[in-house]
């Protein structure tokens, strides 16, 4: 938890906003409105980020190119479509702490997860288990179990779960490492979230990778709630792969194209088994339409089809805002915003709610998960009627996230006032 001495009162929130060097970025997004026309208090960037105001213009630009150029837009549009996805490569690499050749923007998260497991989950008689956290996002669990089934194995014996201690909600680092040390020789793949979607816990990805590699395990991460939220250094940490979506903290829009990281020790090995498609074929000979697949070097060699330009355009708009704001500045503000929210909630301590997200800022991002012992989902609905947008996760968790690109300290203050009144 940050040591900044937060004060109560609306004046303090206004003072924090007045000296916030990132405050003006709020004006580059479209906040939902209440029925009376006021901006909502939008604390749901962990579920769907706000629309950048430039997104519509970027989409319209490509629609005009399509109308005016037809197929020639692939080569002669102002932003030619053939290499369009590469406009995002440098920005994406910086965002996740990777080298440009290690990342590609493509598909959706679960599709990319299947592609990665096709290459990296290679079970043997002795090493066949997949380690996941209990409470992982259901799509990950479905994908993992289906891969185990596909290989003719039994999920009951091949799926290994990390669980928190009794009466705790988050995993302890020492328990994760101990399990890997104990079971590692039978684990083929460690697949964990960078940030758990339910609790908001950020995992020690560097430590997990080190422990996994020490035991000979492949290590991968689902960064759906981490990309654009917490600092990442994927190349230096050394996991084998990672996947993420782009519609949460990255503000790419509903169902936006996802991203994929393949560490360079694998990315430049075209002989690595994979599911192939024509867009992953060496671009120098792609249009010769030959019968044999020759993978491109780098993460681009896992591409299947040509990218959807109209879906990439809003992501490009958002990534340019990230570049202008600076990742270090965004993280610094995020730590303060979340610490401020936690501090204000603590001033309204009640047996009716508790924060289950870790208190240490190194172990969380923007999200706070609030466990309710009364009211339940009806509280979330009542707050929505008052212009406060968070979200509910069964059985008892209300999730909120103050996103540094577009949330203010006054947003946080007003939320806590309305929440504390609603929970009484």
Locations of the language-model features?
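Pyridoxal 5′-phosphate
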Residues: 1-424
